[in-house]
Amino acid sequence: MRLTMRRTLMTGFFQRLQKETQAAQQQMLQAPVFAACARGEITLDMYLSFLTQAYHHVKHTVPLLMACGGRLSDRYEWVRIAIADYIDEEKGHQEWILNDIRVCGGDAQAVRNNQGVGQVSTPIELMVAYLYHQIDRANPLALFGMVWVLEGTSVGVGGNIARLVKQQLNLPAKAMSYLTSHSELDQDHIRFFESLMDKITAEEDRQAIIHSANQVFYLYGQMLRELLPQTQQQAA
């Protein structure tokens, strides 16, 4: 009994976060686009659609982090300091995406202006709105649910997907700056994130992060499902 209790005490929140969001993560990874990519059926239009939606959530990363930092109580001053580091790392990444779109021949201006083929999808619009709502009206730490989804996914499958897309579409490295850099950068980010999460001890805050992660996994998965044309989804 004593050994079991000691092991429980040594288990940090990050491990619990992984466990309690695993089902939602696996559901997201069942999006047909992953199988299509593995079969060599990825198209340039699909890649451009992904970059478009990436832009529409990445452009909110720094504003969301700033909003979160401003809503934290004094007892989470150490999280506010960590957020400042996150902001420094994340600023300007939406411009990388627009550059990738230009290199691929896409309409970066339409994406920036949220017009025509560059419009935000409903799942991403809802995901961003949900996160702002959680920060403003519920628990600002819920933002770290999104951080887990995006950085955990980058580390878990991002590198392999980036290689497949580059090979199948025969793209130059300068068309892959966002996808490639994030699969590499987030290796360090996830270690930092783990240490940060393991310092969260209040149960209500842990629950807020877990719930947010599950919601974001669902909405991000819905966006991924929309990347594949309906005819290909039926075939998959």
What residues fall within each predicted segment?
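Non-heme di-metal
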Residues: 3-236
